[in-house]
Amino acid sequence: MTTIRRFSCNDLLRFTSVNLDHLTETFNMSFYMTYLARWPDYFHVAEGPGNRVMGYIMGKVEGQGESWHGHVTAVTVSPEYRRQQLAKKLMNLLEDISDKIDKAYFVDLFVRASNTPAIKMYEKLGYIIYRRVLRYYSGEEDGLDMRKALSRDVEKKSVIPLKRPITPDELEYD
């Protein structure tokens, strides 16, 4: 049985094996602690039998006005637990919090342009490629900014794709 619950400080010492995947972005401990302190509603872990960490999602809410949105900073599932709809459950949880609690207009995320399996999964979940960010990742790899409109964005303005790629310095952070 899988349990999804809020991430805790103790989990920081238990989730290293999930981060070993080469497609998973990893961060330093203070980065995780900042998210845990500032956006605890957006940080969840999935546990299996024996309290084994199966995956996690980490995000935040940010922006102003019609740019108010939920953001998926990281979502990852350990290879042995993939293809069990776990990432979908974690994504749905973050989307629900963004939509129902924080009344966001959309949820966004960044994904490596080469990570075809993740892109396909996000598209199945209703995300669209909003824009390409040139050289977003280390190694000069492009990133794709993917978005999904939430119920507050009745006209779906937040998911009208941009016509041209942008550079990282053109990104706006709130």
From Swiss-Prot:
Annotated Gene3D superfamilies: 3.40.630.30
Catalyzed chemical reaction(s): N-terminal L-methionyl-L-asparaginyl-[protein] + acetyl-CoA = N-terminal N(alpha)-acetyl-L-methionyl-L-asparaginyl-[protein] + CoA + H(+); N-terminal L-methionyl-L-glutaminyl-[protein] + acetyl-CoA = N-terminal N(alpha)-acetyl-L-methionyl-L-glutaminyl-[protein] + CoA + H(+); N-terminal L-methionyl-L-aspartyl-[protein] + acetyl-CoA = N-terminal N(alpha)-acetyl-L-methionyl-L-aspartyl-[protein] + CoA + H(+); N-terminal L-methionyl-L-glutamyl-[protein] + acetyl-CoA = N-terminal N(alpha)-acetyl-L-methionyl-L-glutamyl-[protein] + CoA + H(+)
Pfam families named among the record's database cross-references: Acetyltransf_1
Domain (N-acetyltransferase) ranges: 2-151
GO molecular-function terms, A-Z: protein N-terminal-methionine acetyltransferase activity
EC number: 2.3.1.254
Keyword Transferase: yes
Top-level lineage group: Eukaryota
Consequence of gene disruption: Reticulated leaves, early flowering and aborted or unfertilized ovules in siliques.
InterPro entries, alphabetized: Acyl_CoA_acyltransferase, GNAT_dom, NatB_acetyltransferase_subunit
Family: Belongs to the acetyltransferase family. ARD1 subfamily.
Function: Catalytic subunit of the NatB N-alpha-acetyltransferase complex. Involved in plant immunity through the regulation of SNC1 stability.
Official protein name in the record: N-terminal acetyltransferase B complex catalytic subunit NAA20
